[in-house]
Amino acid sequence: MAQPGDPRRLCRLVQEGRLRALKEELQAAGGCPGPAGDTLLHCAARHGHRDVLAYLAEAWGMDIEATNRDYKRPLHEAASMGHRDCVRYLLGRGAAVDCLKKADWTPLMMACTRKNLGVIQELVEHGANPLLKNKDGWNSFHIASREGDPLILQYLLTVCPGAWKTESKIRRTPLHTAAMHGHLEAVKVLLKRCQYEPDYRDNCGVTALMDAIQCGHIDVARLLLDEHGACLSAEDSLGAQALHRAAVTGQDEAIRFLVSELGVDVDVRATSTHLTALHYAAKEGHTSTIQTLLSLGADINSKDEKNRSALHLACAGQHLACAKFLLQSGLKDSEDITGTLAQQLPRRADVLQGSGHSAMT
């Protein structure tokens, strides 16, 4: 049987909100920190038990600014779990509204990871600063853009109109983030109330349109094209366009959208490498994407600047099912610029044998 004051038992009582049993246990033991660096206040705030929180703070004088091993305070816990009554109580007792945990996250940032407008309002009304950034350069508005609740974005723009003028340390904007996660209604808010450049690039040269396409969010891509003037042929830092990035991620429907509906050249090349979408799909081993590209008229014999075919990239990546499909579709092996055949690249020399196709063109 657990001794009075056992940390695990105390924490369990707090988690379950059993205030009466907790009082008896603490009175017998004289108080005790919770496990793993958490105080019982952390546990109470995390699980939303305001009555337990108040009892611990008032009857036992527990420090509402105590930190755990991640430097989280009880306010971080309450905010991140969406417990508005606990947030209000802690703020009412003078908790620091913009306290920082590891990685420089404030309670407001943590609240913005959930779709709980009430908690966000509570924090802002008590002076939380939406413009503060964490170690990755994200402010609360940027974090909210990842979650995609349009009401929260509208609220943050109302109380802090300049919150949208932000980018992460790798130059990604809230528009990039909302587009990547496919939040159509959030993107509509960003296009209506913010002034993002249509083809603003992050450190890798990626635009919001590329993000939408490579993640398969065709509705967002269409909106960016129709309402924001995004450029279909914009290139990333390696010269790859949206079509190429869709091939990398295996987004077949997005590829059909680009080629069949928008008229993008299925064999367009990345400027720095001369790779086509077929090359990119083969490099990643996406057999279904290769099928899609071929059905749209892709040239199976296209070569890059090193005279490599899609077969070379499939074999180099050890994507043997993909390589066999290319051979079965009529692609013949050939030497690249160094005289290397694709069949020389797999780790097992026999893997392409029996395909029924000659090794050389």
From Swiss-Prot:
The keyword Protein biosynthesis does not apply. The record marks K102, K135, K165 as: Required to capture Ser that is misactivated by AARS/AlaRS. InterPro entries: Ankyrin_rpt, Ankyrin_rpt-contain_sf. The keyword Cytoplasm applies. It is found in: Cytoplasm; Nucleus. Keywords: ANK repeat, Cytoplasm, Nucleus, Repeat. It holds the Pfam family Ank. ANK repeats lie at residues 36-66, 70-99, 103-132, 136-165, 170-200, 204-234, 238-268, 273-302, 306-335. Gene3D superfamilies: Ankyrin repeat-containing domain. One of its GO terms (biological process) is tRNA modification. GO terms for cellular component: cytoplasm; nucleus. Interacts with AARS; the interaction is direct. Side chains of Lys-102, Lys-135 and Lys-165 capture Ser that is misactivated by AARS/AlaRS. Required to prevent the misactivation of serine (Ser) with tRNA(Ala) by promoting the hydrolysis of Ser-mischarged tRNA(Ala), thereby playing a role in translational fidelity. Binds directly to the catalytic domain of AARS/AlaRS and captures Ser that is misactivated by AARS/AlaRS, preventing the charging of Ser adenylates to tRNA(Ala) and precluding Ser misincorporation in nascent peptides. PANTHER family: ANKYRIN REPEAT CONTAINING (PTHR24173), ANKYRIN REPEAT DOMAIN-CONTAINING PROTEIN 16 (PTHR24173:SF74). This is Ankyrin repeat domain-containing protein 16.
